[in-house]
Amino acid sequence: MAKINDNYLKLKAGYLFPEIGRRVRAFAAANPEAKVIRLGIGDVTQPLTPTILKAFHDAVDDLASENSFMGYGPEQGYDFLIDAIIEKSYKPLGVDLKTTEMFISDGSKCDCANILDIFALDNTVAIGDPVYPVYNDTNVMIGRTGDADDKGYYKGLVYMPCTEENGFFPAYPKEKVDMIYLCFPNNPTGAVATKAQLKGWVDYALANDSIILFDAAYEAFITDPSIPHSIYEVEGAKKCAIEFRSFSKTAGFTGVRCGLVVVPDELEGTTSNGEKYSFNKLWLRRQTTKFNGASYPVQKAAAAVYTEQGWKETQANIDYYMENARIIREGLSAAGVTVYGGVNAPYIWLKTPAGLTSWDFFDKLLNDCHVVGTPGSGFGPSGEGYFRLSAFGNRDNVVEAVERIKKNLKK
């Protein structure tokens, strides 16, 4: 009889967002008249912009003609998109990349999971707490951990608490680690990292022969010119870091699916016999074996983001969401709620009212306000007592949700 991958059985029951969905569906079934406003999972609400949509349509039309039809594309991505990203998104930061160092994908969630294919299982991994669940769960699935303890920490992973006391920025691990997940602007806390803070991590990684897995999915929401958009703005980072980016929130591609990974040529790991080997070559080999590339229409649409008009439209949507963040942050703060994030990041991280756990507050908002958020404890034990709200909602719904919450908390 075929055996299963028992590592999946170590996972806590239900991925965070499906559990939220289950509770919301149950509430909606019991209260069909209720207008539920969802500010939980970070899905966007604004449509694709006209320039992006036209590029999409034109690319689909290309597939309708024998003369312009496109079949299998390059697994690494089309040069027209890679070149546009390097020219428009990295060069202005002072970061020079080769086209061979960038890989286009169908989204950064997949990349954050798939990157584990090129790392040995006996590497020691450090992740933040609270953390985007994908970092934690994919390491469990692949077999890098033991079982979870009563708090939810998995044996074999090093957890770095990100708390109110340390400004939601992790301290360096006391033990030796080989791989470090960093996400800035952060999901779920909305915290950002200064260049000096990132330099500290780069210096740490170089000194300890560690690799940083840097998730920059929300870099487009940074407005403070002093906050770095890429870890490669720090000298030496190409020798110790892989960077992930996404079009999901930046350009509304949550249903379109497109992302990218940067694996610098300078980045090397060690083989089992102690020799150095290129991670770039390993990732290329992995992609050419397991991935056929993001679709041609998707990559054409993504490239349109970097045209002058395309970026103007994209920035307008980003501004729309950041205004939502301001409304949530200032509205709840005025109601006496302690809030973090929502500046340079599209997530608001708030403290739950005294005496309420994260899931208690979830149920309170759902039942009393008909508003859905995300319990902080779902992101890790250090998230207990906190709650995440997303700025990706429709403006009218955001305003109404904030008013409902304020009214309820004043009772």
Swiss-Prot record:
Q: Does the keyword Transferase apply?
A: yes
Give one Pfam hit by family name: Aminotran_1_2
Binding locations of substrate: 15, 42, 109, 132, 187, 292, 388
Q: Which InterPro entries match?
A: Aminotransferase_I/II_large (IPR004839), DapL/ALD1 (IPR019942), PyrdxlP-dep_Trfase (IPR015424), PyrdxlP-dep_Trfase_major (IPR015421), PyrdxlP-dep_Trfase_small (IPR015422)
User: EC number(s) on record?
Assistant: 2.6.1.83
Which residues in this protein are found as N6-(pyridoxal phosphate)lysine?
A: 249
Recorded GO molecular functions are: L,L-diaminopimelate aminotransferase activity; pyridoxal phosphate binding
Q: What is this protein called?
A: LL-diaminopimelate aminotransferase
Q: Which organism is it from?
A: Citrifermentans bemidjiense (strain ATCC BAA-1014 / DSM 16622 / JCM 12645 / Bem)
